[in-house]
Amino acid sequence: MKGGNIVTNWHLLHFFDQQQPRKATVLRQILTNKRTGSVLFWGLRYHYLDYLNAVPRLDVKKFDDVIDELLAQKWLHSSTRGLQLTSQGQKVLATHQTAYSFTDHPELNQKFDYQLWQAILLLMVQVASEYRYHNSNYYVANQNLKAQFLIKSWLQVNSFETLATEISECLAQFLDQCDPAKADLFTAKLVGHTQNGLSDGQIASQLEISPLEVSWTWRDLALQLAAFIRARSNLKIGQLVQITALPGALTPTIRQTAMLFNEGKTVDQIIQMRRLRRSTIEEHLQVLAISQPDFPYEKILSESDLETLTKVYAETAIDQWQYAELQQQGIEMPFLKFRLYAIMKTHGEYNE
């Protein structure tokens, strides 16, 4: 994903559907980790939420240019409701995709700072390898100063032997459970005493895939390795992984709203206690409902509300619901209730 470019000329087709129109702006905002209530709602509707923060440095112009190209190729079709995958586009996907085309665990981009973790990982492997060969005079392949500082600080408390033993054992165990071809791709990029890591381009040439697919696959495996190490609490190198951990989907301010809401406070009480705008608190509750399938909707949606909303929207697909429909029928209801009902019904669809 160097330079924030996540696609060749067809990879974005993966995010579109033949039945459901989807807006490219939502995909772009999801990839760059925009977390407004509206973006997250449509991300939920489009099954995009696992891809939050997948490309934080996305080149927006290149993204837009690729969308235009896919439309020009007639692999996507545009309507007022969004973009849909065409039958031609589906054939392109089926023909071109390989085992390296898409990540297996995109959700891990939300759990770890990839740029920092990648630098730490590459340095750990190199330092461990040189230690095994009793070599203390070598050129450090990765120039990330923060990663260098963190590893030096860690080694002031822990031994080189611990580093070498733990990282070698973890790599062996982790790669043993991976697809062999992907494991080979991953190790080809590592730097050691007698091994100069290959570039994405060199690996791509060997495997006859695109450099992007090499980058994407390596990133996916690196993040999986971070999760693998963190799950083993006895490992000292887990401290280095933990440094790269991201705070998660819920910001501290949303967590504070959640705490008050779970204590039984009403929306009005939370607004008064937190001295925040109603729109802010209501957005917090939308984000909570999106991220928590067991959200207690009954605290906000009464039986009467549910009856009204069901009557108005029963015959319409969720993607086509309009808040204005309530007003047109002379029904006064806060937008929060309308949106929470849509979120509740969406989670219900996915659990059927």
Enumerate the language-model features and the residues they cover.
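Short, amphipathic alpha-helical "recognition" segments used to contact nucleic acids or chromatin
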Residues: 10-18, 183-197, 250-264, 306-317
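Exposed, interaction-prone assembly regions rather than primary DNA-binding/catalytic cores
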Residues: 101-176
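Accessory beta->alpha helical hairpin/"wing" motif in late/C-terminal subdomains of nucleic-acid enzymes
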Residues: 77-118
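Short alpha-helical "recognition helix" segments of helix-turn-helix
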Residues: 27, 202-205, 270-272, 322-328
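Short Lys/Arg-enriched helix C-cap and helix-to-coil transition segments
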Residues: 225-242, 292-307, 349-352
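A short, conserved structural fragment
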Residues: 68-81, 227-228, 294, 346-352
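Short, amphipathic alpha-helical interface elements at domain boundaries
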Residues: 2-58, 146-158
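Basic amphipathic alpha-helical segments that dock to polyanions
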Residues: 62-77, 220-222, 288, 345
